[in-house]
């Protein structure tokens, strides 16, 4: 049994040594995919916003807007559960013995996850959120499911949540720093803060049912959006943790990492 285990570990170590430390293709493809997708969404809004998005009782509204809502919600829920399940199913069950080079490679993979997560947060919590405020300051709503809400609340928010949970689960199941040494407060805040913006949508829409107010972040009803949004600054804490671990791995393992030995 020990011979088999030793042979398997030797083969794994050889495969790790051949794998590049950083593969930028997933990061590039993820960035391009998100940006192209949202540019397409923005063009769709431009074409069908005024044409079919002003009267929720019109059949065009159901055709061009409610159909999107009916499709995106189950797709996002399934994606969330499938990603969490896959990350857990394929987790590394021996994090205490991850090779230094492999751990470094996984750190770079996590950085790619975080960068794509940041891009998704920009589109959802910044671009489409500001757009939503502009829409509702110029158009009188007759439904909570306005065109801008269908894109902002029920598309862009769940999308960055799915990407965020992917990165969080990757860290918890692949990296010893996050998976076998307790919980990282910084990473928990980085994921939970933006995530909590989504359930806060319910409070926001309930409030708008009773009060008419300008779509400004200084309005009390919108304070929690800002509060949870600022949690994204925890990315600096996560960055410091990752950089600290990179320094630890590099010290004394230069030959494994493909680095020049320190003089």
Predicted features and spans:
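N-terminal topogenic module of multi-pass integral membrane proteins
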Residues: 1-92
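C-terminal transmembrane-bundle signature of multipass membrane proteins
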Residues: 35-37, 184-263
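Membrane-helix interface motif
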Residues: 37-57, 90, 123-138, 198-211
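Membrane-interface segments at the starts/ends of alpha-helical transmembrane spans
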Residues: 54-72, 137-153, 212-228
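Internal transmembrane alpha-helix with an interfacial aromatic "cap," most often the third helix
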Residues: 72-135, 167-168
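Generic alpha-helical transmembrane segments
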Residues: 73-85, 150-169, 230-233
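Membrane-proximal helix-loop-helix units in multi-pass membrane proteins
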Residues: 116-182
């Amino acid at each position: 049994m020990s011979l088999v285990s030793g042979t398997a570990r030797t083969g794994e170590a050889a495969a790790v040594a051949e794998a590049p430390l950083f593969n930028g293709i997933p990061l590039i493809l993820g960035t391009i995919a998100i940006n192209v997708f949202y540019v397409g969404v923005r063009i769709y809004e431009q074409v069908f916003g005024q044409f079919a998005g002003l009267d929720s009782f019109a059949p065009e509204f159901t055709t061009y807007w409610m159909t999107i809502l009916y499709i995106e919600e189950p797709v996002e829920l399934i994606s969330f559960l499938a990603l969490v399940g896959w990350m857990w199913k394929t987790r590394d069950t021996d994090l205490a013995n991850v090779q230094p080079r492999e751990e470094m490679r996984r750190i770079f993979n996590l950085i790619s996850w975080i960068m794509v997560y940041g891009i998704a947060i920009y589109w959802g919590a910044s671009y489409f959120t500001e757009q939503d405020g502009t829409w509702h300051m110029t158009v009188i709503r007759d439904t909570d499911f306005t065109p801008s809400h269908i894109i902002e609340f029920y598309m862009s928010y769940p999308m960055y949540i799915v990407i965020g949970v992917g990165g969080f689960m990757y860290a918890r199941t692949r990296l010893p720093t996050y998976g076998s040494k307790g919980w990282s407060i910084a990473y928990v805040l980085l994921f939970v803060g933006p995530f909590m913006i989504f359930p806060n949508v319910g409070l926001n829409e309930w409030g708008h049912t009773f009060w008419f107010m300008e779509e400004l972040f200084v309005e009390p009803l919108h304070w929690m959006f800002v509060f949870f949004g600022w949690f994204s600054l925890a990315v600096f804490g996560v960055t410091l943790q990752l950089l600290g671990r990179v320094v630890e791995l590099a010290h004394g393992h230069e030959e494994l990492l493909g680095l020049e030995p320190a003089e």
